Amino acid sequence: MIQVQTMLKVADNTGAKKVMCIKVLGGSKRKYANIGDVIVASVKDATPGGVVKKGDVVRCVIVRSKRGIRRPDGSYIRFDENAAVLIREDKNPRGTRIFGPVARELRDKEYMKILSLAPEVL
């Protein structure tokens, strides 16, 4: 469950290391985001020479969440950390690599490029 002020790890090679959620997209009263949801975030920590720098405002999709998500068969999938991937307006990732596993629920939200780059889909 991601809300405003939540810090997330960045799971791609854009140069950002940590981002902080500043808005959950999808309605004026929406408070929380989970796996597959899009947020607006500010880059809080970045590596030198990366695509993005500290202070940039970016769009991200949540790929891992400590809260987890319930599947139709009744099982739950949850992760050890909150992680996001920086995306463009057309839902494609800004980076060329994805680090760590991602949830299968991204397929329902049509993030096929992220799924194809990910080393493991759970």
Curated annotation (Swiss-Prot):
SMART domains: Ribosomal_L14. InterPro entries: Ribosomal_uL14, Ribosomal_uL14_bac-type, Ribosomal_uL14_sf. The keyword RNA-binding applies. One of its GO terms (biological process) is translation. The keyword Protein biosynthesis does not apply. CDD domains: Ribosomal_uL14. Keywords: Ribonucleoprotein, Ribosomal protein, RNA-binding, rRNA-binding. One of its GO terms (molecular function) is large ribosomal subunit rRNA binding. GO terms for cellular component: cytosolic large ribosomal subunit. Belongs to the universal ribosomal protein uL14 family. Binds to 23S rRNA. Forms part of two intersubunit bridges in the 70S ribosome. PANTHER family: 50S/60S RIBOSOMAL PROTEIN L14/L23, LARGE RIBOSOMAL SUBUNIT PROTEIN UL14M. Part of the 50S ribosomal subunit. Forms a cluster with proteins L3 and L19. In the 70S ribosome, L14 and L19 interact and together make contacts with the 16S rRNA in bridges B5 and B8. HAMAP family: Ribosomal_uL14 (MF_01367). This is Large ribosomal subunit protein uL14. It comes from Acetivibrio thermocellus (strain ATCC 27405 / DSM 1237 / JCM 9322 / NBRC 103400 / NCIMB 10682 / NRRL B-4536 / VPI 7372) (Clostridium thermocellum).
